[in-house]
Amino acid sequence: QASKFVNWVNAKDDVYYHPFTEPQGFNKVDPAPYWQSVVEPTCSFSEAVSFQQYLCEQGLAPKTIANKEYEVIANYGYHLDAAKFITLLRKHCISELGVEHISDTVERIEQASCGDITCLQTKEHGAQLADLFVDCSGMRSLLLGETLKVPFVPCDDVFLADTAIATQVPYINENDPIACHTISTAQEAGWIWDIGLQERRGVGYVYSSKHCSEEQARKTLANYVGLEEVKTAKKINFKPGHRKIFWKNNCVAVGLAAGFLEPLEASALMLIEASANYIADQLPPNKELMPITAKRFNAIML
């Protein structure tokens, strides 16, 4: 129900909450000047204007057991096990939406003389033809980047983090408290995310490899979770940046195929959802109108 930022301004005892519920009357009155002139030295902005910080500090839920499904007292998001969520979505799409799911390897991509992608030649299922191709191939950007040659625009001059080490931390006891907010703790060369799930915590260190070695990063992560060493951590290398455009010809990239800045999961999911909704809502009735849709999509998403 919030994001808690620890030690981002000062290296000790500095905490700021970004609550998901806006202060009462926030769209009508700006409370910032009053906070600055009256209470800034004694408490943070979120503490002064929102009750949600108190819910988080007390480990309370944003709703009660008496609330109906999706009925809330305070706004909240979901902490999900990504692997289980993918399985759920796949089953739902196949059984309820009639989607044909093909798991295969793309061996060759064929194009028309105008540059449009005509089909994907797969290893086990042969040619897969379509009018529109959505590139969800991850950072490789197989269709938009490798095939249609849309250049990558690096952002490493302002986003210094380029490496992440992620691990899973089980709860010691089944009754251990589960944080009802995401915790983001600043470190010397980056920041650590800490997300409480039902059966475990997802913890990872995002850092700049120019300012921290992998060995140092692992030690920092181990110290954070209270272990001598982290043995099962997964290392992820990434280059912050994005494709120059996200839609070219009859191919549109969504998610990592379009770009990646930092493992800011909520922001990334929002962009994926916004992209999918736009494609579904604005899908042109014929290929002749696709350039107009692509131009609008690129203007909005970039």
Describe the predicted segments one by one:
Residues A186-N237, A257-E273, Q282, M290:
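Conserved FAD/dinucleotide-binding core of flavoprotein oxidoreductases
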Residues Y278-L302:
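Active-site-proximal substrate-binding core of FAD-dependent oxidoreductases
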Residues C251-A253:
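Residue-level marker for buried hydrophobic side chains located in beta-strands
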Residues N67-A222, A276:
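Predominantly flavin-linked oxidoreductase catalytic cores and closely associated redox partners
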Residues R218-L221, R243-K248:
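Single, function-defining residue in the core of a domain
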Residues A2-W8, V106-E107, K235-K239:
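Short, glycine/charge-rich beta-strand/loop segments that flank catalytic centers
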Residues Q1-Q58:
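Dinucleotide-binding Rossmann-like beta1-alpha1 core, especially the glycine-rich loop
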Residues A2-V9, N175, Y224, Q282:
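Extended charged low-complexity segments that act as oligomerization/scaffolding linkers
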